UniProtKB/Swiss-Prot annotation:
Domain HTH lysR-type intervals: 1-60
Residue ranges: DNA binding: 20-39
TM region(s), chain numbering: none
Name of protein: Uncharacterized HTH-type transcriptional regulator YafC
Top-rank lineage group of the source organism: Bacteria
Keywords: DNA-binding, Transcription, Transcription regulation
Originating gene: yafC
GO molecular function: DNA-binding transcription factor activity; transcription cis-regulatory region binding
GO biological process: regulation of DNA-templated transcription; response to ionizing radiation
Length: 304
C-alpha cells in the first residue's frame, strides 16, 4: 500500500518537533494515533525510519533520506495551495510575533496601529523574549532577530541595521566626568549584559586592535533595563542607536567617545520557518515592516 499524505505529514511533524507528544499537540491528535501512523508508514515501507529511545528520537539512515524527500514534497504542496488561496484571501487570523523588549517598544510599537488599520482582520499577539526561542515550540509566526541567520530551516527578510553607541546621563557625567579613552572607561561604572555575553564587547578598539570587553558593575539581561539604569545615572552603557537616539536628541542621554566608536553593524531581520507556506498575514506583516523602514524619517532606522 502507498503512504497517505496524512501519514507523511505526521512523520515530518514528529521529526521536526523531536517527539511524538509535541507532534501530537501541534496536530491536535492523541499520542497513540501519531505513534500508530508512523508505525503504519514504516510497515508500508518495510524499513525503520526512527530510532526510539526513552530519551530521544533520531532518524535512521533510511529515515534521513526519506525525511528530506518527504519534507520537500510537503513544502511544495503547501506552497502550491497557498499560492492558489492567496489570489482570493484577505490577510486574517492570529499572527504571533516575538522580539526582544527594545525592538517591541521602539520599532514595532509605532507600527501596530497603522498595521491594524490596514489589516483589521489580523489579530496580533506580541511576545517579548530576551533570549532566542524555538519558533515552532513557542508557536511563533514571525520573530525579529539581530545578527546573522545560522539556522538553515529559517528564512530571513532583512529590515534594518543598527549601530551601538556608548552613553551616559548628564547627571552621571556631572558627578564622574566623561571618559575619553579605554583606560578612562575602566575607572567608571559600566552597565553590562548578563546574556548574551557578546554584548559586553564594546565597539572600541584596544591598542592591540581587539575590541574592548567591558567589566561591568551592574548587569541585566534586558537592554531596556540597562537603558533605564543609565537614564537614572547609574553608569555608562553601550546600546543600539534605535532605542536611545530620541533620548540623545532630547539631552536625556549623552553620547560618549563618539570619535573612537567603530561602526560595527548589527543587522535586524524578520525571521520565519522556511518549511511553512508563507501565509498572507505573515507576508503582509513583513511587507509592512519593510515598507516602514523604506519610508521612515531619517535616523529612525537604517534600512538593511
Amino acid at each position: 500500500m502507498k503512504a497517505t499524505s496524512e501519514e507523511l505529514a505526521i512523520f515530518v511533524s514528529v521529526v521536526e518537533s523531536g517527539s511524538f507528544s509535541r507532534a501530537a499537540e501541534q496536530l491536535g491528535q492523541a499520542n497513540s494515533a501519531v505513534s500508530r501512523a508512523v508505525k503504519k508508514l514504516e510497515m508500508k515501507l518495510g524499513v525503520s525510519l526512527l530510532n526510539r529511545t526513552t530519551r530521544q528520537l533520531s532518524l535512521t539512515e533510511e529515515g534521513e533520506r526519506y525525511f528530506r524527500r518527504v519534507q520537500s514534497i510537503l513544502q511544495e504542496m503547501a506552497a502550491a495551495e497557498s499560492e492558489i488561496m492567496e489570489t482570493r484571501n484577505t490577510p486574517r487570523g492570529l499572527l504571533r510575533i516575538d522580539a526582544a523588549t527594545p525592538v517591541v517598544l521602539h520599532f514595532l510599537m509605532p507600527l501596530i496601529k497603522p498595521f491594524r488599520e490596514r489589516y483589521p482582520e489580523v489579530t496580533l499577539s506580541l511576545v517579548s523574549s530576551e533570549t532566542i526561542i524555538n519558533l515552532i515550540e513557542r508557536k511563533v509566526d514571525v520573530a525579529i532577530r539581530a545578527g546573522t541567520l545560522t539556522d538553515s530551516s529559517l528564512r530571513a527578510r532583512p529590515l534594518f541595521n543598527s549601530y551601538r553607541k556608548i552613553i551616559a546621563s548628564p547627571d552621571y557625567i556631572s558627578r564622574y566626568g566623561k571618559p575619553e579613552t579605554i583606560d578612562d572607561l575602566k575607572q567608571h561604572i559600566c552597565l553590562g549584559f548578563t546574556e548574551p555575553a557578546s554584548l559586553n564587547t564594546w565597539p572600541i578598539a584596544r591598542s592591540d586592535g581587539q575590541l574592548h570587553e567591558v567589566k561591568y558593575g551592574l548587569s541585566s539581561n534586558s537592554g531596556e533595563t540597562l537603558k533605564q539604569l543609565c537614564l537614572s545615572g547609574n553608569g555608562i552603557a553601550c546600546l543600539s542607536d534605535y532605542m536611545i537616539d530620541k533620548e540623545i536628541a532630547r539631552g536625556e542621554l549623552v553620547e560618549l567617545m563618539a570619535d573612537k566608536v567603530l561602526p560595527v553593524e548589527m543587522p535586524f531581520s524578520a525571521v520565519y520557518y522556511s518549511d511553512r507556506a508563507v501565509s498572507t498575514r505573515i507576508r503582509a506583516f513583513i511587507d509592512f515592516l519593510s515598507e516602514h523602514v523604506k519610508t521612515a524619517p531619517g535616523g529612525a532606522v537604517r534600512e538593511a
